[in-house]
Amino acid sequence: MVSFKQVRVPLFTAIALVIVLLLAYFLPPRVRGGGRVAAAAITWVPKPNVEVWPVDPPPPVNFNKTAEQEYGDKEVKLPHWTPTLHTFQVPQNYTKANCTYCNTREYTFSYKGCCFYFTKKKHTWNGCFQACAELYPCTYFYGPTPDILPVVTRNLNAIESLWVGVYRVGEGNWTSLDGGTFKVYQIFGSHCTYVSKFSTVPVSHHECSFLKPCLCVSQRSNS
């Protein structure tokens, strides 16, 4: 019989053997049952590929289409808004004023024989017809023509926007109380428009009940 005193194991081998025994004891989970000890094996699973975007991205939205053309329904049901198409009619009581007046103390700017006003209070787009008509004598809700629009936007700061009187009824052309036809960057089936600091044409809005200042105008007298 060989005693342990007679067995000579190199120091490095002894240390390695101790480490292996410790790892075998502590690392694998121990499953006890029926007097046996089973070690659970560790299996490495490669990380699955995660696609951050579909292979075929969705087609872009055609903003020149109405909601009915785009989605086959006259109403677009989204969590926070539901625009209904082609329901707008010009209020009969609010038309272009046939008189002259200019409040030189309150106008925002004057240009080409007209006085322009940005209302101090905010209104819905439909409410701008009444707000402008009641602002001062001879004022009405104005749709800026291409020569007037740059002057309007220069008087806005970078975060401002305001409702303008460019609209359409049904599938008709975009127009205003002054008449004519307007080019509009349109979305869905909206009938209301606004402009901001960097607008080059009026832009239709998906929610005409938002509150914004209104663009009003009155003709100046020649005297």
Curated annotation (Swiss-Prot):
It comes from the Viruses. Its main location: virion. Residues 1-8 are intravirion. It is found in: Virion membrane; Host membrane. Residues 30-223 are virion surface. Residues 111-217 form the C-type lectin domain. Changing R220A: Loss of HLA class II binding and fusion competence. Keywords: Disulfide bond, Host membrane, Host-virus interaction, Lectin, Membrane, Transmembrane, Transmembrane helix, Virion. It is a single-pass membrane protein. The chain crosses the membrane at residues 9-29. Disulfide bonds join C99-C138, C102-C115, C128-C214, C132-C216, C192-C208. GO terms for molecular function: carbohydrate binding. Changing Y107A: Loss of HLA class II binding and fusion competence. InterPro entries: C-type_lectin-like/link_sf, CTDL_fold. The C-lectin type domain is essential for virion-induced membrane fusion. Forms a complex with gp25 and gp85 via its N-terminus; this complex is used for invasion of B-lymphocytes. Interacts with human HLA-DRA and HLA-DRB1. This is Glycoprotein 42.
